[in-house]
Every structure is written in C-alpha cells, then in structure tokens.
C-alpha cells in the first residue's frame, strides 16, 4: 500500500466548521439538536463517568449501600436510557454465569445471638436495615448483640421508626422518668427555679453549735481499714439493728425545741442535704414544707425517695429500667437503690465493736427506741441537734435547727482523743454491665489505682457523695469512712463482700468534689424565704423528673395524710361486687 502524505490527509478532512456525526432531521427539533427525556428525571450532570452504580462495582452491594446520605446519581435522560440500548440479536435471558465463590450461610453472630444486619454491616439487604436496630447494644456498633428491648428507636428501610437525631444523637430525648409524687389538679404552682439560678446563690454561715445529743456510739473496728486478702474476703453480714429515720415534724425533740422558739427552720440532715445538693441531683424527689406561724418545717413523706441510696445517678449512661422478667432487672435503678440501702444499713452495723463496756453514751437515751416494742437491739447512733445562724442581718434573725447523725467513734492515733465518724458504703454491681459508668474493677484496681476508683465514683455518684459529705460537715464529724462493697457474683444481688474502707476528712473531701456549703445554705435560705412570704399552710418542693428544675406547689392542708384511703375504697368496691 502506497504511503499517504500529510497533505493528503489534511485535504481529506471535512471543510465544515463542526465535526462529528452528520446532523439529520431525525435528531433535530426546529433545527436544534435534542435528546429524548422524561419529566421524572432528576436534572444533574450532563455526564458523570466517575460515579458507580447503586450496587457498586460488578453489581455487588457494598458499604455505600448503607450510607444514609447516599442518593442515586441520576443524570439527565437516565429515565429513557432504554431508547439507546443495543437491541440484541437473540434472547439472552436464560444466560447465566456460574460463580465459584462460596456464599456465607452463617446466621449467628457474637455469643449465641441471632444476627440481624444493622447500619454499618457489609452486604446486607435493603429491607433488613434497621438503623439503630433491635439487636444493637446501647452505645455499641450496629449488628452486635445487646439489650434488644432498650434501643428500638427506628431507623430507615424496612425497620422504619422514629425520626433520626443529630450528630451522635446529641438532640435525642433522654429516658423519661416518673415523678416522685403525683401532681394533683388542685395543687397551685407558685415558683419554678432552674438549677442555673440555684448555683449562683451564696450565704456564709458559722460552724453551728450543739444544742443536745441523744443515743450512744460503739467504737469503730480498725481491722476493716486493712486491705483484705483475696482468699479471705470479708462477707457482708446481715446485722439486725433498730435504726430510725423519723421525719422532722414527728421528732419529739424538735417539737420541744419548736415550742421553745429555738429557731425558725427545722429539718433533718437527710432532708437538708438533699436541698443543699439539689443542683447535682438527676433523679426526682420531693420535700414537704409546712409553715406554722413564723416557723418552717422541712418534712419528707413516708417511704419517700429521700430514704433510698441511689446508684450511679450522675453517670453519663445511668442505669436503665429493664422489662419485667429480664435478666438485667437487678441492675435497674429501683433495684439498685434497694440494694444500696440494704448494704449501707448492714455495713454500718458490721464495722462496729459492740461492747457495752466500751461504748460512748450521749447525754440522753435514744428518743425513738422503745425496748418494750422492739425485738432488735438499737444500732450505734448518736443524734446531735445543732443550730445554725442563717440571718442576713441582726434585725431579722433566722436560725435553723437540724438533727444530725453520727455512726461511730474512734480513738485518734496521735492524741488518743475520741473522734466522731460517719460510716457510708459505695457498692459495685457489675463493672461490665450497662449503667456502670465506666467504673474500674474494684477487686483489681482498688489497691493499685485507688485515686482513679474514687475519682470515677465522684463523677458517677456526685449527688450521693455530696449529700454524705454535707451530712458529715453539719454533724461536725471528724472523719467520714467510705466502704467499698461489691457483689460476690455480679449476677446475684443478695451476697456481697467488703473490699476495703477509706477515711477522709469531710471538708477535704468537699474541696476535692468542688462542693460549696455556702451555696447550699443560700439555696436553703431562698426556698424558706419563698414560703415565709406566703400564707400559712403546706407546700411541696418537687424536682422535675426529666429537667433540672425545682417547682414549689401549694397543696391542701390534708395532703399526704390520707394515704390509706385508696386501700379502703378498693376493699369496698370488691365487697360490692
């Protein structure tokens, strides 16, 4: 073949200005080129050669399939692509490719759990996507076996449910808790105070003075301060002793002091500490406030939540309510509170050296113990009635009388003088369970990393520890003993072991917790002033169960005194049937 010169090639090129296929009348509309399209097409790029199909390369479903932001990259004219498809000469619908790859048939995931693909798993079907699905552990990855009944907020696809929340679900609603007391229609709301306002209050007071003391104290057993050997752990024993937590208005000593006009405000250390530490509280509670003349009594209802010891109330992932019959029912808040209250009662009685010859008697006997009615001996307890000055000026004096409690007495190792102790107990239920708040394993870390263990407890139980510290300070206790009690078996809540006891000076512990007593006294004075400005009657201060808000209600005079009426009505109805 003869070679072609460059000049011949150039001369053979079309002489027209444009290049490409020749334009015919079939591909023009009034002389303008066009392409067939559908009105349902999404207008986008004219051509995107980098985009993959919905199923990824080779039609395989991939991770992109589960991207919540994924949207088919439809281009202009895609809806009518069949018009440009190549017409096959013969039917190839029966043609198939034999794959030599093995399909996975596993239907189990993790430790015995049924595997349902969740968001983030590869190769799942679109209709089984569940977002944060039924088998997702709270705070875990998609598809892991967890607490199926805890997090069923819907996702996308076939398991569609509620709306999606923001980044890391920052705006999702928290778990809803029930109020500690039912708000009745005839209650009148007077004030609503948020915790931010309470945190700004401040009132400096004195250290208080003792008015009188009742009861007796046993000496603390220093053997519990020693770290127990792992092979010989101390078991928490059931020690039946009579202890009392009488409300303010039912205390015979406070009634006598009120008749003598000793103070304006009367309270117990449990009620007062809850009010002073209210900005740290998360769980709901309520305090009954009774104004009689110029006197104010801070009371509690029978079987109120103030008597219960909370567990991990301030944890970022606090314990959650479990369904009835669930294996995690022992780790729900109400069960943990009962367990912690039981532990504190028995621990305080077990660490005493009970000896009639070596006990410290107060000026008066226990005002609540009646030997003719009680079958159990009285617990080691001293009730000290103390007086504090909450006056803003000398012209308007306001004093507070509070009943404080001391649990034990101990000899000072240096001076040999008696020191008053308060004894409390922290409890560990399961460091790996939901609601543990990232706590360390006490059995392995309490000795080597004691500071880290205590710091974690300060974070997870800020309100509880603050209340104990306030009670110790207003009682003028020298040392606050904290016991560390754990379950013998994490799955059982009826057997416990004592892992160690640590003592602190209450004011040093308060400074570590950033606890301000002047802020607490300011809160007390503010709430009391609200009631003194009102008429005589009964009021209820309620902590909102789901918001950091306190509400003050005015209630009828007979409220909370007819708790047994409901039972009588039910019995009458049954008899009529």
UniProtKB/Swiss-Prot annotation:
Residues 103-177, 558-577 are annotated as: Disordered. Residues 305-319 are annotated as: RNA gate. One of its GO terms (molecular function) is translation initiation factor activity. Its main location: cytoplasm. Residues 560-577 have a biased composition (Acidic residues). InterPro entries: eIF3d. The keyword Protein biosynthesis applies. Residues 166-177 have a biased composition (Basic and acidic residues). It holds the Pfam family eIF-3_zeta. It is found in: Cytoplasm. The keyword Cytoplasm applies. GO terms for cellular component: eukaryotic 43S preinitiation complex; eukaryotic 48S preinitiation complex; eukaryotic translation initiation factor 3 complex. Keywords: Cytoplasm, Initiation factor, Protein biosynthesis, RNA-binding. The RNA gate region regulates mRNA cap recognition to prevent promiscuous mRNA-binding before assembly of eif3d into the full eukaryotic translation initiation factor 3 (eIF-3) complex. Belongs to the eIF-3 subunit D family. mRNA cap-binding component of the eukaryotic translation initiation factor 3 (eIF-3) complex, which is involved in protein synthesis of a specialized repertoire of mRNAs and, together with other initiation factors, stimulates binding of mRNA and methionyl-tRNAi to the 40S ribosome. The eIF-3 complex specifically targets and initiates translation of a subset of mRNAs involved in cell proliferation. In the eIF-3 complex, eif3d specifically recognizes and binds the 7-methylguanosine cap of a subset of mRNAs. Component of the eukaryotic translation initiation factor 3 (eIF-3) complex. This is Eukaryotic translation initiation factor 3 subunit D.
């Amino acid at each position: 073949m003869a070679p072609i010169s460059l000049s011949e090639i150039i001369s053979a090129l079309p002489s027209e200005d444009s290049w490409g296929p020749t334009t015919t009348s079939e591909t023009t509309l009034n002389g303008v080129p066009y392409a067939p399209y559908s009105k349902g097409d999404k207008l986008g790029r004219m051509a995107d050669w980098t985009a993959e199909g919905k199923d990824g390369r080779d039609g395989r479903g991939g991770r992109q399939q589960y991207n919540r932001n994924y949207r088919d990259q439809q281009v202009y004219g895609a809806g009518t692509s069949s018009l440009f498809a190549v017409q096959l000469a013969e039917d190839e619908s029966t043609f198939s490719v034999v794959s030599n790859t093995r399909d996975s048939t596993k239907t189990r995931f993790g430790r015995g759990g049924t595997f349902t693909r969740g968001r983030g798993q590869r190769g799942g079907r679109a209709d089984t996507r569940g977002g944060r699905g039924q088998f997702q552990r709270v705070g875990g990855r998609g598809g892991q076996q967890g607490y199926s009944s805890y997090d069923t907020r819907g996702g996308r696809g076939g398991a569609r449910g509620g709306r999606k929340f923001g980044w890391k679900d920052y705006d999702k609603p928290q778990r809803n808790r029930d109020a500690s007391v039912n708000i009745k229609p005839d209650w009148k709301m007077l004030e609503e105070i948020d915790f931010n306002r309470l945190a700004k209050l401040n009132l400096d007071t004195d250290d208080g003075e003792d008015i009188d003391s009742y009861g007796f104290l046993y000496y603390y057993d220093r053997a519990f301060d020693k770290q127990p050997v792992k092979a010989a752990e101390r078991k928490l024993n059931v020690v039946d002793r009579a202890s009392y937590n009488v409300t303010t208005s039912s205390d015979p000593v406070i009634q006598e002091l009120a008749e003598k006009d000793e103070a304006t405000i009367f309270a117990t250390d449990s009620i007062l500490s809850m009010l002073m530490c209210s900005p740290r509280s998360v769980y709901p509670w309520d305090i009954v406030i009774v104004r009689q003349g110029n006197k104010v009594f801070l009371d509690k209802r029978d079987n109120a939540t103030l008597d219960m010891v909370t567990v991990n109330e301030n944890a970022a992932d606090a314990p959650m309510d479990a369904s009835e019959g669930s294996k995690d029912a022992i780790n729900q808040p109400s069960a943990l509170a009962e367990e912690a209250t039981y532990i504190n009662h028995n621990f305080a009685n077990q660490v005493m050296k009970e000896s009639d010859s070596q006990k410290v008697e107060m000026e008066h006997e226990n005002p609540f113990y009646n030997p003719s009615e009680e079958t159990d001996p009285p617990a080691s307890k001293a009730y000290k009635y103390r007086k504090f000055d909450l006056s803003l000026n000398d012209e308007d004096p306001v004093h507070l009388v509070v009943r404080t409690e001391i649990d034990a007495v101990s000899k000072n190792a240096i001076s040999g003088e008696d020191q008053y102790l308060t004894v409390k107990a922290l409890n560990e239920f399961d460091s790996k369970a939901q609601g543990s708040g990232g706590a360390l394993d006490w059995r392995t870390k309490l000795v080597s990393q004691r500071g880290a263990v205590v710091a974690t407890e300060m974070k997870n139980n800020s309100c509880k520890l603050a209340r104990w510290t306030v009670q110790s300070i207003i009682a003028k206790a020298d040392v606050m003993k904290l016991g560390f009690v754990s379950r013998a078996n994490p799955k059982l809540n009826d057997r416990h072991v004592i892992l160690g006891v640590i003592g602190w000076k209450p004011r040093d512990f308060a400074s570590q917790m950033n606890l301000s007593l002047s802020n607490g006294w300011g809160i007390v004075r503010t709430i009391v002033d609200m009631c003194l400005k009102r008429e005589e009657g009964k009021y209820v201060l309620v902590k909102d169960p789901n918001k950091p808000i306190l509400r003050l209600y005015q209630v009828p005079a007979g409220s909370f005194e007819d708790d047994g009426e409901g039972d009588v009505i039910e019995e009458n109805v049954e008899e009529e049937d």
